[in-house]
A protein has these predicted regions:
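N-terminal substrate-binding region of glycoside hydrolase catalytic domains
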Residues: 1-152, 156-158, 163-175
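Noncatalytic carbohydrate-binding groove/subsite architecture in carbohydrate-active enzymes
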Residues: 17, 131-134, 139-140, 146, ...
Length: 232
């Protein structure tokens, strides 16, 4: 795998540090809250599968992918408005279940009420190619250089949420090594897409507060310690 995708990035702009550490995790309809509170950093959830649809055609690696114009333009408007107010934006990219696009969920995973979000699918060829194309689309659209999004800029990217708990990244019971290996493949794909577009964007994963102390039900193979994830 590539270790330095940033060298080919067309956007080599320096990372812009937020003016203050005061921030807010927002919904798309919370523009006024952010302005009223005077925050200079916001986190926005991006529902991965909702981006597929119609209205925007995107060519990637010899294939055409179709994106939901109304969803994309809603994100364009909100993110560009924040940037216009000198507010830095972090995207938390989450893989929600979509019956129309089962290829986005890790192969072999069944829909369950115990999961909020699912593991990204880089296991099958179709899943990998579609997932990679969506990552590339997001990286390009929110590079700060795309006039189609009114130059909307995402500076920080987080793949999934609290990855040591499968409620946010469900793939079914798995030992720690298998789980981390699966997430790692998705993360490398994500990292490459972002950094090969904007060299100095920052790409993260997140953990919850269970660092070393085990969950009560740690042996169920869907919960792991944060330390275990990092060490693996």
């Amino acid at each position: 795998y590539i270790t330095n995708p940033e060298v080919v990035a067309s956007n080599q702009d320096a990372f812009k540090t937020p003016l203050t550490k005061k921030g807010l995790n927002i919904q798309l309809n919370m523009l006024n809250d952010a302005f009223t509170l005077g925050v200079k950093h916001v986190a926005v959830n991006i529902a991965f599968s909702q981006f597929l649809g119609s209205g925007i055609d995107y060519e990637y690696d010899g294939k055409t992918y179709h994106f939901n114009k109304s969803v994309v333009e809603n994100y364009d408007k909100v993110i560009s408005t924040y940037v216009g107010k000198d507010i830095s934006v972090t995207a938390i990219v989450l893989n929600d279940w979509n019956d129309a696009h089962p290829e986005l969920v890790h192969a072999g995973t069944a829909k369950t009420s115990s999961a909020n979000y699912y593991m990204f699918n880089t296991k099958t060829q179709e899943g990998f190619e579609t997932t990679r194309a969506i990552f590339a689309f997001l990286a390009d659209r929110y590079s700060g250089k795309n006039h189609n999004s009114n130059y909307a800029k995402i500076s920080n990217w987080i793949l999934g949420n609290e990855i040591n708990n499968q409620i946010w990244n469900y793939m079914g019971p798995a030992d720690l090594n298998t789980y981390v290996s699966t997430y790692q493949q998705a993360f490398r794909t994500f990292y490459t897409a972002i950094k090969s577009t904007s060299a100095n964007d920052r790409v993260y994963f997140s953990l919850d507060f269970w660092w070393g102390a085990p969950y009560e039900n740690l042996n169920d193979q869907v919960h792991y310690t944060g330390k275990g994830i990092v060490d693996t």
